[in-house]
Amino acid sequence: MEFFLDPSTWAGLLTLVILEVVLGIDNLIFVAILSEKLPPNQRDKARLIGLGLALVMRLALLSLISWIVTLNSPIVHNKFFSLSIRDIILLFGGFFLLFKTTMELHERLENNHHENSENKNYAGFWAVVIQIVVLDAVFSLDAIITAVGMVNQLLIMMIAVILATFLMLLASKALTNFINLHQTVVVLCLSFLLMIGFSLVTEALRFCIPKGYLYAAIGFSILIEIFNQIARHNFMKNQSRRPMRQRAAEAILRLMVGEQNKKQQIKKIEINSQKTDSIQSSKEMETFKDEERYMINGVLTLAGRSIRSIMTPRSNISWVNTEKNTDEIRMQLLDTPHSLFPVCKGELDEIIGIVRAKELLVAIEKKIDASTFSSKILPIIIPDTLDPIKLLGVLRRAQGSFVIVSNEFGVVQGLITPLDVLEAIAGEFPDADETPDIIQENNSWLVKGETDLHSLQQLLNTEELIKEDNYASLGGLLIAQKGQLPIPGEIIHIHPFYFHIVKATEYRIDLVRIIKNQDDN
């Protein structure tokens, strides 16, 4: 045992342990990939048995060192090639590794491994263990021959093999979990195994490929994959800072837009193909209609909208002024296609109450004072900063009535009905006395200045309009873009659209024509 006092013995032991770990990594990678085919509760067991058998096999082969040394003696020899027992084992192991790795790569590239865990068909436990043992035999032989070439003492070899296997056991679970969680790493590892299998075949046939080249290629690939994982980690970290609703909406809309972009290909399939199954598959691909995409987007983006973008603005509110005579009030109620009215004294900010048109008409016929009658139902007033999701609860409590939106100074900004919320989700439903906010013409859109930006953005299929929450209408956007109220005839460019001001007063923008620049499309 005095050789343990020799520093060169410890240096050789350390070097051999490192080499054994390096030579065992490919074995460890294959064990990790094979163990994924087993049920989760059997994977650790298979991994431990696989590495345990590798240790037993290597210790057994170490005890047969004198026989292993003779494995390099040719047993098949002719003028074209010569093969030893070692070469035959390496050749068999190389082809087996190439076959298994190719099958695994094919499965990954065809995406056949993504199945429901409840319905997934797992491989048999011992079938996986046998495959691990076969590869262990090949990798063990390579590791033992390396050990024999480096160290003369059998005890040192056994200690190095035991330590290397113990280190691999410690790292095996973490490596397995990492590989299984990162599918790009799995493909990278399978590519490494392809290279290793090819090198085993060429080595068996005496075509020498310097191991340094292989290690350099593997090291460079690992470096690139590290950069890839860092980039992905930073991307996920930046994405996590964004609102969850916004990320979910974008993901779902990307899916729907992807389906929408297939329509042209679907039509070609229907025209060119005479087969019933092709036509049937093309119909199944048309999953989402434009209206469905609009509504889903409206639901997903509702929470991120402001109350101002949902409400009917102050300028469009039809209200009853109690300072008018009864004949004027009666004519207003009969001519306006609304069933509910806010009743005010002189101006909209002086709200007395909310009445139904037919009930107020009956009260007027009975000579009942409009102010007295209207004060029975007081208005529900909400701030213009209220969250749209909380607004739904307020509308439920209103029991079919509307709610008044007011700013911090008590000035009425607009009103919201359940129909306004529905329009925010499904699009515009014009009243009998209204014209549509958006009229689509040949290659342009004629849009009212008060049109909600969210609805317009969905219709134009763009994300370039809403950059801030300071404005909710098209007019507000164009005024903010120009820095002042634009005049009729002016053109404002917001990529990829041109906004032609058709009609504007000194206070607001009334009508805009939108034209998309086809060169920017």
Swiss-Prot record:
Origin organism lineage: Bacteria, Pseudomonadati, Pseudomonadota, Gammaproteobacteria, Enterobacterales
GO cellular component: plasma membrane
Keyword Repeat: yes
Record organism: Buchnera aphidicola subsp. Acyrthosiphon pisum (strain APS)
InterPro entries referenced in this protein's UniProt entry, alphabetically: CBS_dom, CBS_dom_sf, FAD-bd_PCMH-like_sf, FAD-bd_PCMH_sub2, Integral_membrane_TerC, Ion_transp-like_CBS, Transptr-assoc_dom
Keywords: CBS domain, Cell membrane, Membrane, Repeat, Transmembrane, Transmembrane helix
Compartment(s) of residence: Cell membrane
Name of the protein described by the UniProt record: UPF0053 protein BU323
Gene Ontology molecular function terms on file: flavin adenine dinucleotide binding
